[in-house]
């Protein structure tokens, strides 16, 4: 009977202890990040967990798609967008903590071709992109109505007088990485992506860089989300502006803002 009593007491102690142990385990920080951030954020997440013990889980897609998911209640702690518009959209809907929002990175907009391509294109020359596409080629871009890279591309094409000759020859994709893949696989002779995307894929080469004044400045804002109840969220957002994190982003082809 004494042995039974001992095990009963031990079981009670264990049951009381389990919730404490579970809460002591660090919950991962969930980040919704623009597709163009994949390599850099994968590396940053690994570095942060190694330094702090806090795991980071990142989901990638077009900023537009991620913002809509957050608006609909998808569980996330941090939003890392490829443009200001979608971050502003969430902030206007009260879903972002303004005090924990930072304009962290910049990028360039480039015209890419498969690495084996011999094409040379001056995007300032009238009709140059349409001519380079040939008779049946299509220009790979992100969706021009919603995907940040697609919107930047459309603005640059209009500014440089190329839009009318290529607007009916666009292969619009759900994200900038999907557009990059079309070029990488040789399914499109040309595409418009970020400079960091081109650096991430050895199967493409940069044909031209669009002038900075042909489109709005490319800015990547990051922010903690209002509905996050993860105590590690603020620390992670702050760490993204640290020297170790900035070194990762710079190495991957991004320019630094803050």
Swiss-Prot record:
Gene Ontology BP annotations: molybdate ion transport
MF annotations from Gene Ontology: metal ion binding; molybdate ion binding; tungstate binding
CDD domains per record: PBP2_EcModA
Binding site for molybdate: 36, 63, 149, 176, 194
GO cellular component: outer membrane-bounded periplasmic space
A Pfam cross-reference name: SBP_bac_11
Signal sequence extent: 1-22
Protein's UniProt keywords contain Signal: yes
Chain coiled-coil ranges: none
Annotated family: Belongs to the bacterial solute-binding protein ModA family.
PANTHER family according to UniProt: MOLYBDATE-BINDING PERIPLASMIC PROTEIN, MOLYBDATE-BINDING PROTEIN MODA
The protein's name: Molybdate-binding protein ModA
Species: Xanthomonas axonopodis pv. citri (strain 306)
């Amino acid at each position: 009977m004494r042995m039974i009593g001992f095990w009963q007491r031990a079981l009670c102690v264990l049951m009381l202890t389990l919730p404490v142990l579970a809460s002591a385990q660090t919950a991962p920080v969930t980040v919704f990040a623009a597709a163009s951030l994949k390599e850099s954020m994968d590396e940053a997440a690994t570095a942060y967990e190694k330094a702090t013990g806090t795991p980071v889980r990142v989901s990638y897609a077009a900023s537009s798609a991620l913002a809509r998911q957050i608006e609909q209640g998808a569980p996330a702690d941090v939003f890392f967008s490829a443009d200001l518009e979608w971050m502003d959209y969430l902030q206007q809907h009260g879903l972002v903590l303004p005090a924990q929002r930072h304009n962290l990175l910049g990028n360039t907009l480039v015209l890419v071709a498969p690495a084996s391509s011999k094409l040379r294109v001056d995007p300032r020359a009238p009709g140059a992109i349409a001519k380079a596409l040939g008779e049946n080629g299509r220009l790979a871009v992100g969706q021009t109505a919603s995907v940040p890279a697609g919107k930047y591309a459309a603005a640059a094409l209009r500014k440089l007088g190329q839009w009318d000759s290529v607007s009916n020859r666009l292969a619009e994709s759900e994200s900038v990485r999907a557009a990059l893949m079309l070029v990488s696989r040789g399914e499109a002779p040309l595409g418009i992506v970020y400079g960091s995307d081109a650096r991430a894929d050895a199967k493409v080469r940069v044909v031209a860089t669009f002038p900075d004044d042909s489109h709005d400045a490319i800015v990547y804002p990051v922010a903690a989300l209002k509905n996050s109840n993860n105590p590690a969220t603020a620390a992670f957002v702050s760490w993204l502006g640290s020297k170790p994190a900035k070194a990762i982003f710079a190495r991957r082809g991004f320019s630094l803002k803050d």
